[in-house]
A protein has these predicted regions:
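Extended amphipathic alpha-helical segments with heptad-repeat/coiled-coil character used for oligomerization
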Residues: 294, 303, 307-370
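Bacterial N-terminal signal peptides
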Residues: 9-19
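Sec/Tat signal peptide C-region and signal peptidase I cleavage site
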Residues: 21-25
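Ser/Thr/Asn(+Pro)-rich, low-complexity disordered segments
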Residues: 26-227, 231, 243, 256-265, ...
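Carbohydrate-binding/catalytic loop surfaces
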Residues: 206-219, 275-278, 282-292, 329-357
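Internal, well-ordered domain-core segments that constitute the primary functional module
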Residues: 255-320
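Bacterial N-terminal signal peptides that target proteins for export
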Residues: 1-10
Length: 712
């Protein structure tokens, strides 16, 4: 029982000591510099057993109902096959097997194909169970079904690529041979998911190895998202390291897979240093990319695989660490959730590596993380814990999603001791449901609290409404919404998402008449095209004071001033007896909602550290004396004067997605947004093929020399 587990941790310790110095070249970026190994081990203690103790769910196993008793039971039958009731012995036909159920059998009568992507989730607790109890014959049998071996879609492949190096030898030579045969022929012309979704046909079948001339081996149309491609390509490289030289991976010889894989990941890293990545700071999908890279780091068994996987891991974690406050992400995200920072994979990873609060203790640990020898360096630790001079500003030039257009969007971030505020100037509606346009995170004694909002197209703190534009300078942000117009030339663009999503007019919607569940759910359903701007304020954030058309929030860590564009605003809260098990309105379980009405609606938020004032009264007096907001509804212009006497001027652009902005009278240009090229800040600069770090006098740079990262 202990054999696989003991060998795993021995293997990890050997690799940690053997390779870290060779890979990093500089102590500042070495995994050995990670400053909290004891704390990390304490935090992950018992997590493998916890993962193993979770119920084993065979989501691919269909159900049937006894025609005599009406009692349901599980089967392994295909639709139309004869089955027998275990209660009465009656023979009858298996009905539909569900999305994940078995669909085909091979010539030996074994299930050769399942629907869906069940092993995205099911394989992880099974792996944990087998690491602790190798002789579980039921689980070993389940993982020997040919249809399960064939599940090499990206999420499942990423899980198999951790299972195989850890447990393949324990499964035996015959199992390994069958697994290698499944991998050798894997190709899919459909796109199974972990939910009941169907997609259009693919232009090119998916496989593990990919298309050699495309970014990470996937074409822009339907070759997979950034995290999909990282999971597939990393899995192929791991398989290539552990399969015989004569084996095939999706039809490709092992030797060619190794060469192609190195090319994919080296090219991706070089692009990161020139443009940044397209799926930036994704709270949803970064964990899956990270897990694929951890597989490479731990198991690809070549110096080049460890070098490139570590370099990319370091980049992803460093560039997200400075935006993290107590494990919650502030600022913009690409492919982020509509309800940010509610706990999940990324927060769990932060908790284990950095000791930040666990926002959802019931969420399972990442098997990949807790069985990996990779550790973030002290530099990344310092970025995460803000162990450098504060406050700080960061400008980021974001590329298009496929990294083929630099500076496609412009992000700004302001970080202080207890809060982070960030936003992005967007030029395209691209997967707007998963675009976080702006957010504010505040550290509190009760954990991090996240604010967000916009015109209620998505009715959530996140999402990109085509009617919303922002402007930010340091600790001040203006959020505005109005009707838009689509210029004539844009109407000729095929598939123009702005034309499709922003052509409907905005309409007045009266406030809900009660705080009851039915009324609020109905109101939320009608609010998508409301002529208003919403602000989601976490419950328990602090005491709220409403003074002279300003809303002040008193918190022990920070003070906020919210200035609505007009006096026509109101609060929406759920009643004490309301319960929202599903739907958009469930957000009111954790938030109260400020609604600002108007054809040109919005608000300005200014936030300061509470210890920068002797008392809240002093802050209030300073707001009354210095803070000013001027709004011209006709011209859609806003000018805000801050406590620091900086002026932030926004001019809403009805025919665009990005406002015109002036700061202290100077026009803000977007063409050369980030002087370094990608990231520009004191602790972190990226661009023109170089990553530069500077924390407390420890200065280093990384660039690619002789086809590998060079640390200076």
């Amino acid at each position: 029982m202990e054999k696989a587990l003991n060998s795993l941790f021995l293997y990890s310790l050997i690799l940690l000591g053997l390779f870290s110095g060779q890979v990093t070249g500089q102590a500042i970026f070495s995994t050995d510099s990670y400053p909290d190994e004891k704390g990390y081990q304490d935090r992950i203690s018992g997590e493998l057993k916890g993962l193993a103790s979770s119920p084993t769910l065979f989501r691919s196993q269909p159900s049937a109902r006894c025609p005599d008793t009406g009692i349901k039971f599980k089967t392994w039958a295909l639709e139309g096959e004869i089955i027998f009731s275990p209660f009465t012995g009656r023979a009858f036909l298996q009905g539909p097997t569900g999305y994940f159920g078995p669909k085909k059998r091979d010539e030996n009568g074994e299930i050769s194909y399942f629907g869906g992507d069940a092993l995205k989730k099911d394989l992880l607790p099974i792996t944990a169970k087998l690491l602790l109890q190798l002789n579980d014959s039921l689980l070993r049998g389940f993982l020997s079904i040919p249809g399960n071996l064939q599940q090499q879609y990206h999420f499942a492949a990423k899980n198999w690529a951790r299972f195989y190096p850890l447990l393949a030898d324990e499964m035996g030579p015959a199992w390994k041979s069958e697994f290698q045969k499944a991998v050798a022929t894997y190709s899919a012309s459909n796109r199974p998911s972990d939910g009941y979704r169907k997609y259009d046909p693919l232009s090119t079948p998916h496989n593990l190895v990919g298309e050699p001339d495309e970014l990470l081996g996937g074409n822009k149309k339907d070759g997979g998202t950034e995290n999909h491609k990282i999971m597939w390509r990393s899995s192929a490289w791991v398989y290539a390291a552990h399969f015989p030289d004569t084996a095939l991976i999706s039809g490709w010889p092992v030797s060619e897979v190794k060469t192609l894989s190195e090319r994919y990941f080296s090219d991706f890293y070089e692009r990161l240093l020139k443009t940044g990545n397209g799926e930036y700071d994704s709270e949803i999908y970064y964990p899956h990319s990270i897990e694929g890279l951890l597989n490479l780091y731990d198991f690809a068994e070549s110096e080049s695989a460890r070098v490139w996987s570590k370099a990319i891991l370091d980049y992803l974690l460093a560039t997200i660490a400075f935006k993290s406050y107590d494990g919650a992400l502030a600022g913009a995200q690409k492919r982020g959730p509509s309800l940010m920072n509610s706990g999940g994979e990324l927060n769990k990873m932060f908790h284990f590596w950095f000791g930040s609060p666990d926002l959802d203790p019931d969420h399972p640990a990442s098997l990949h993380q807790i069985t990996s020898s990779y550790r973030p360096s002290k530099y990344i630790w310092d970025l995460f814990h803000k162990s450098f001079p504060l406050p700080f500003e960061v400008k980021v030039s974001r590329p298009s999603y496929h990294m083929d257009q630099a500076n496609h969007a412009q992000e700004y971030f302001y970080g202080s001791k207890n809060f982070g505020l960030g936003s992005i100037y967007l030029t395209q509606l691209d997967n707007p449901n998963q675009q976080v346009q702006w957010s504010l995170v505040i550290k509190t004694a009760k954990g991090p609290k996240t604010l967000g909002g916009s015109q209620p197209f998505h009715r959530s703190p996140g999402g990109h409404s085509p009617y919303t534009q922002t402007a930010q300078h340091k600790n001040v942000i203006v959020v505005a919404a109005a009707a838009t117009e689509v210029p004539g030339e844009e109407t000729k663009m095929s598939g123009n998402p702005r034309l499709n999503l922003a052509q409907k007019p905005l309409n007045f919607l009266a406030a809900p008449t009660s705080t009851g569940q039915i009324e609020l759910e109905k109101w939320f359903a009608e609010a998508k095209q409301q002529e208003a701007t919403w602000l989601f304020i976490p419950k328990g954030l602090g005491k709220i004071h409403e003074i002279k058309n300003k809303i002040l929030i008193e918190n022990s860590e920070a003070y906020l001033c919210i200035s609505p564009f007009s006096s026509d605003h109101y609060w929406v809260e759920a009643g004490a007896d309301s319960n929202f098990p599903k739907g958009k309105a469930k957000v009111l379980a954790d938030y109260k909602l400020l609604v600002v009405n108007g054809s040109f609606s919005g608000y300005c938020i200014e936030i300061v550290e509470s210890d920068s004032y002797a008392s809240f009264s002093e802050f209030k007096d300073s707001i009354n004396a210095n803070s000013r907001l001027e709004v011209d509804i006709i011209t859609r212009k806003v000018t805000h004067t801050s406590l620091a006497l900086d002026t932030l001027h926004m001019e809403y652009q009805s025919t665009a997605l990005r406002a015109k902005v002036k700061i202290n009278g100077a026009v803000i240009g977007f063409d050369k947004w980030s002087p370094s090229g990608v990231y520009t800040s004191v602790p972190l600069k990226v661009g023109e093929g170089v990553f530069k770090g500077d924390v407390n006098g420890e200065i280093f740079s990384i660039r690619v020399n002789n086809n590998k990262p060079s640390y200076d």
